Amino acid sequence: MKPEESECLCIGVLPARWNSSRYPGKPLAKIHGKSLIQRTYENASQSSLLDKIVVATDDQHIIDHVTDFGGYAVMTSPTCSNGTERTGEVARKYFPKAEIIVNIQGDEPCLNSEVVDALVQKLRSSPEAELVTPVALTTDREEILTEKKVKCVFDSEGRALYFSRSPIPFILKKATPVYLHIGVYAFKREALFRYLQHSSTPLSDAEDLEQLRFLEHGGKIHVCIVDAKSPSVDYPEDIAKVEQYITCLSNAYF
């Protein structure tokens, strides 16, 4: 452990798995000349509240690549079943004083760092919050109907009730707001390690959504509504969509 690691109080962890069932080798996929993981890392590094960014992986190719572009990566156990378990291993081994641990999914190359900061601020300002995650309003029918996009419903106090790949809520008669979940989780340390002690759950397995494991064991997830909605990479065909998004952003500034 490096001395500066032990002193970090707020860290960002980017889980990056090589053998993704949907897209093997995804972290190194090129997007306009830069890898997916490099773009995600560089965007996260713009956060004003994270003391350290670290890639958590199970593959030496990713370690070498992150080191080559000047990032920081560590090897985690191949037995980790999801990104949150990988995040927890990093926090336990390398950052014993970290009070807030942000799990930033490695497939969010266009994530605005202001989203990360908003989660950290909400976690710090709300004593009852133990896990905060962002959602964004959508009116796009394709996004609402596809199983690739996770939807979230929450109560009047901003506490998540459920996450699903199905369209929720069901729209019966009139237009109802639909919120998409963005794959970032800001944990208080105690909540993260409590999650790691929980066994897998039926709904989490059925939907293939790790956050449901936290809900099913009685945990409370607070949502943070954000304006920033950007494309993620789940399948090879998503690369072209992300490249188009980046091109449109570039054209808007020049």
From Swiss-Prot:
Q: One GO molecular function term? A: 3-deoxy-manno-octulosonate cytidylyltransferase activity
The disulfides recorded in the entry are: none
Name the principal localization, coarsely classed.
cytoplasm
Compartment(s) of residence = Cytoplasm
Q: Which GO terms describe its biological process?
A: CMP-keto-3-deoxy-D-manno-octulosonic acid biosynthetic process; lipopolysaccharide biosynthetic process
Please verify whether the record's keywords include Cytoplasm.
yes
**Which pathway, metabolic or otherwise, does it act in?**
Nucleotide-sugar biosynthesis; CMP-3-deoxy-D-manno-octulosonate biosynthesis; CMP-3-deoxy-D-manno-octulosonate from 3-deoxy-D-manno-octulosonate and CTP: step 1/1; Bacterial outer membrane biogenesis; lipopolysaccharide biosynthesis
Alphabetical GO CC annotations of the entry are: cytosol
Q: Which InterPro entries match?
A: Cytidylyl_trans (IPR003329), KdsB (IPR004528), Nucleotide-diphossugar_trans (IPR029044)
- Which catalysed reactions does the entry list for this protein? 3-deoxy-alpha-D-manno-oct-2-ulosonate + CTP = CMP-3-deoxy-beta-D-manno-octulosonate + diphosphate
- EC nos: 2.7.7.38
User: Of which family is this protein a member?
Assistant: Belongs to the KdsB family.
What the protein does? Activates KDO (a required 8-carbon sugar) for incorporation into bacterial lipopolysaccharide in Gram-negative bacteria.
> What is the name attached to this protein's record?
3-deoxy-manno-octulosonate cytidylyltransferase
Organism for this UniProt entry:
Chlamydia pneumoniae
Gene name of the record: kdsB
